[in-house]
Amino acid sequence: MNINVAELLNGNYILLLFVVLALGLCLGKLRLGSIQLGNSIGVLVVSLLLGQQHFSINTEALNLGFMLFIFCVGVEAGPNFFSIFFRDGKNYLMLALVMVGSALLIALGLGKLFGWDIGLTAGMLAGSMTSTPVLVGAGDTLRHFGISGTELSSALDNLSLGYALTYLIGLVSLIVGARYLPKLQHQDLQTSAQQIARERGLDTDATRKVYLPVIRAYRVGPELVAWTDGKNLRELGIYRQTGCYIERIRRNGILANPDGDAVLQMGDEIALVGYPDAHARLDPSFRNGKEVFDRDLLDMRIVTEEVVVKNHNAVGKRLAQLKLTDHGCFLNRVIRSQIEMPIDDNVVLNKGDVLQVSGDARRVKTIADRIGFISIHSQVTDLLAFCAFFIIGLMIGMITFQFSSFSFGMGNAAGLLFAGIMLGFMRANHPTFGYIPQGALSMVKEFGLMVFMAGVGLSAGSGINNGLGAIGGQMLVAGLIVSLVPVVICFLFGAYVLRMNRALLFGAMMGARTCAPAMEIISDTARSNIPALGYAGTYAIANVLLTLAGTIIVMVWPGLG
């Protein structure tokens, strides 16, 4: 039996789609030196190659892909977007505006200089900024801008072509810039990170290991009684001196949870909770009594929970003000917008921040109720909320405003982004509403993006050879300019107008470009995860602005429509 693969794939859109995805994901795992191609570029390359062979896919699959992707971007940005936008992020907002705004203006100028149409120009902007949201926003706006069928088809093909020709240019140039730009300015990033660490008490150890606290029991000996000198537990401040706290005391066969007024006596058996290294550093006064192996005394369930900051008595407070250790809890991580932050007593908590806390289950529950709620560990997605807000986003995108003969609408991309932000924000404030496990959210987001990339590659593949011959050199120059010049402008603005700390500034610049590989290079150069503070500050805002940039570049293009 002979099987015609070409006819088989052309006759089955679903099969073609998953063949493109599988081959593209395999290609994306390849590395060029220290740079991995990545899933997006892998799928794009495979789809372009198959597109040259005149394979095509249903455009509805492409539309669904970009809708799922942009909605999930909004859900991820939602928990911290408003707090950054309205309160904590004036500098970060301005940096993101400078980065995206300058790139938009430069792209418009280069597009007109080289005589390109809106499709090539918007695609070049998206590729040079390595930003799929720009591509999504521009494509959606083109479809709803009243352009004729032939002109629309050409613009969409050129949009994909421009993106494909400049994506690697944008990615590689930014990674190279992230490695060498810090060396061209007079302040060393490592020194800048150490400086702000001293000012704010930051833990600059980016490779800090996290351990669960353990419980061990000791019998109180004469040395420990003499050390206490008749003081109660509150006066002793045992945690400050040892890194451990007393969870239980057995006295005369009676087991009790001590309060601050308890005084240790000879023969007491005490259960100490702390990290392993804290136990190892205990003064001999604690260990000279015989270690006790008492099942009841040691019966304690240590848990680690992710606590979401919500309550007004925690939002806006510094970490030190929570006094977690006074409540028998240990802080392992602070996560903001899916980015791990340095553990700093002076970090001001935002609504939606996630604190990873360890300790006795009862104590962790108490502290969680005081500052917010324990993140649900269910693997069940609230599909009703997901679908409802998706519908709301589509309806927002249908709204149009008429000004004389000119009409303006948000489009599906902006509508879904806004609806996703609202869902993410409400999820951060209401523990029982709209829960989507991070794994499920990442899977839907990644799948939507891959479907979208497959669609744009298949539609643009037939014209890529002509495009390379006619405009390849121009695209190379334009891609480098749009990728690097806004970064330099952003650096000058942040360094000499906002006068930001260089470690925070470079992190914020990479956040404004939403480029995680470049962020890793900045952290390595600084030998610190302090730049993550700046990255988190601009990342959520930049995702929104980049989507809007794709819409704006189409709307302001002269003579369109």
Curated annotation (Swiss-Prot):
GO term, biological process aspect, one: potassium ion transport
GO molecular function per UniProt: monoatomic cation transmembrane transporter activity
Keywords: Cell membrane, Membrane, Repeat, Transmembrane, Transmembrane helix, Transport
Ranges where the RCK C-terminal domain occurs: 202-288, 292-373
Transmembrane segments: 8-28, 32-52, 66-86, 94-114, 158-178, 383-403, 406-426, 451-471, 475-495, 540-560
Principal place of residence: membrane
UniProt entry tagged with the keyword Hydrolase: no
Membrane-topology descriptor: Multi-pass membrane protein
Family according to the record: Belongs to the AAE transporter (TC 2.A.81) family. YbjL subfamily.
PANTHER family linked: K(+)_H(+) ANTIPORTER SUBUNIT KHTT, TRANSPORT PROTEIN YBJL-RELATED
Entry protein name: Putative transport protein YbjL
Native source organism of the sequence: Escherichia fergusonii (strain ATCC 35469 / DSM 13698 / CCUG 18766 / IAM 14443 / JCM 21226 / LMG 7866 / NBRC 102419 / NCTC 12128 / CDC 0568-73)
